[in-house]
Amino acid sequence: MAAPNSLISLLGRTPDPEQLRHVHTIPARKAVNEPWPHWVHPDIVDAYGTLGIQEPYRHQIQAADLAHSGQHVVIATGTASGKSLAYQLPALDAIHRSELRVLSDPGKIHDDGAVTLYLSPTKALAADQLAAIRALKLPTVRAETYDGDTDVASRRWIRDHANFILANPDMLHFGILPNHTWWARFFRRLRYVIVDEAHSYRGVFGSHVANLMRRLRRICAYYGAGNSFPEPIFIAASATASDPGVSFGRLIGAPVREVSEDCSPHGSTTVAFWEPALTDVRGENGAKQRRTAVAETADILANLVSSRVRTIAFIKSRRGAESIASITKRLLDEVDPSLPGRVAAYRSGYLPEERRALEQALRSGQLLGVSSTSALELGIDISGLDAVLVAGWPGTRASLFQQIGRAGRAGQDAIAAFVASDDPLDTYLVNHPEAIFDVSVEATVFDPGNPYVLGPHLCAAAAELPIGPGELDLFGPTSEDLLDRLVDQGYLRKRPAGWFWTHPESAAGMVNLRADGGGPVSIVDAETGSLLGTMDSPQTHYQAHTGAIYVHQGESYLVEDLNEADHCVMVRRVNPDFYTTARDVTQIEVLETSRSVQWGDVTVHFGDVKVTTQVVSFQRKALISNEILGEEPLELGARDLFTKAVWFVVDNRSLHGAGLVEAEFPGALHAAEHAAIGLLPLVASSDRWDIGGVSTALHADTGVPTIFVYDGHPGGAGFAERGFEKAKIWLTATRDAIKACECDNGCPSCVQSPKCGNKNNPLDKAAAITLLGVLLKDAT
């Protein structure tokens, strides 16, 4: 491979491409090794030796030592740093030694055997870990996956005999905890719980998993009372994150030690910051639009593949991954007809054998280019890659580092490029690389106390075992009031010994781990009658309204009918050259203010709000150019959302003092609100679509100009609260992003929003910069 700096010229068609905004070099890192700990059985050391692992890295041993000594621990280091060895070592050693004791005295009943539970967010990652465990060929270790694909006979054998079980949170919630009496032997012996990819548990999903971990701990305590280890040790593997020990401690509800110094070797990585050029395509209000990240990334991928540079392009959506692959193939066919066959899309939804074949083709070099969703971001072992492209901000710095870490995995130098999408956050980051590399990685944000999440988990916990008064601390300070509310609603019955589940139906069914309520709506293929999938009711107005393009496993479907009464959406398979975006109008009411801070004449609040939203129309936009092809009205009912918000209050006098007149207030507030929504993911691990906003020159509850930004989930998800805590950093970045945009009057890269039901009108870019200056004047 050529030197990384020379590869920059391959990204574009000239040695100094105009789209290149900045170049940042991540320096190479040498390995720091440690000897094997004295407590590790020689058989375990020998097993790793057969795989070529002779001496572990320091961070692996630090984490393994902490877990072996009985302390909960999280290891938060980079991609390909060997985190799995850190949790495998104590777990396999405990299993191996306990099995050897059984073999040495087969006539004796042994009650102190050790077992391990491994949890991952995806079945694919669990399958890879299973292969890694089996590769060690330790005859004492009986490792098996336990998920929705496991047949009934195998489940019984796994419960009774497996000592290293790999599962996911969904199976723990639906299959294991509600049936804990079947698992009594397992829970009595459970020594370690491994939580892989812990940074992925954020937002509402993270809130659910946090309560799931508390339920797991109380079941373990029930079966472990009186044992030599009454509660298992939790070990987490995480991407780099801010305060990983604090975050994982909040996830499991217990103090945690952290190991975050990466001592594995890595070649240098040259990171290019790439902003697609403005085009002649005009969007709303005549604003110029940039070339899309999809089209730009496909161009770059074609350039790299034609130079035989092995490359992965990451993008968040399945449709985006498929589009990048198809455009790249078309471009390569014009250059060399042998090359299109060496490019493929990789996404979730493939059959296991298809996924394995793609991974092997990439490892062997048969494939030169892959466009992928985050399926490859997780810890699947793909090595020997030369370049990584990231199409659009992946959501968090942790995800970005996970993705660019795929290049140069075997220690060689590599190149990565961040290709900006046409939105405020990407605009800011591509012009401010220091916001990625010179600050700590963002915290993992979730709220276990969200009553819409905690309530159903309290019901599930009570169904598993009655909740005693001494357990209230485990579920947080709001749990007692919430339990009494559940009694009033008829879900629970209170007795002197605690709270009991009294309903005949499954309490676990009240919880949807990966969504936030509203009940599932079925997505049905109108031609075949087959069920394609389900969607939460709150999402349907945005993603499954009549006329919407719905994407399932890379295939596009046109929504023909949304039947809310029957909870059903009928779709028909199509092959469109456009996508759809819903637009809404919103009203907001302040219910309660929890926290406030004064910035001179500006007040920043955080608290409870009622948001009333109505989807009023949708736009069709060209896949490649983002050109608006048309807009159609929708007649959908308004919906209420009770959630959390942060809001900024400023009086007219302060705005007048900055030179603004009242006619400019609405456009300034509206533009600042849009940009602030786009920039919140900079400080909170949210997606732009997780949050919403409202601005008004005269709000009924404040009586003055106000900007609201709220969590788009019932009860909140922690994003707005993070915005309140980091408000100065957040608004400073918002102002800088608007300033950095080269447009004249506002565009999708700075102050326009694809969701705006007011057709991005009024917007005043210059006045928004002035307004943000007023808000920040006395910020602390």
Language model region names:
Residues 2-20, 317, 553-562, 568, ...:
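Structured, non-catalytic alpha/beta "coupling" segments that mediate domain-domain communication
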Residues 8-51, 55-58, 62, 68-74, ...:
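Helicase motor core with emphasis on the C-terminal RecA-like subdomain
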Residues 106-108, 774-780:
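Acidic, low-complexity intrinsically disordered tails
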Residues 414-416, 422-436, 457-468, 484-485, ...:
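Extended Lys/Arg-rich polyanion-binding regions
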Residues 481, 743, 755-758:
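Auxiliary Fe-S-binding modules of radical SAM enzymes
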Residues 741, 746-750:
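Short cysteine clusters
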Residues 749, 758-759:
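Juxtamembrane regulatory segments of integral membrane proteins
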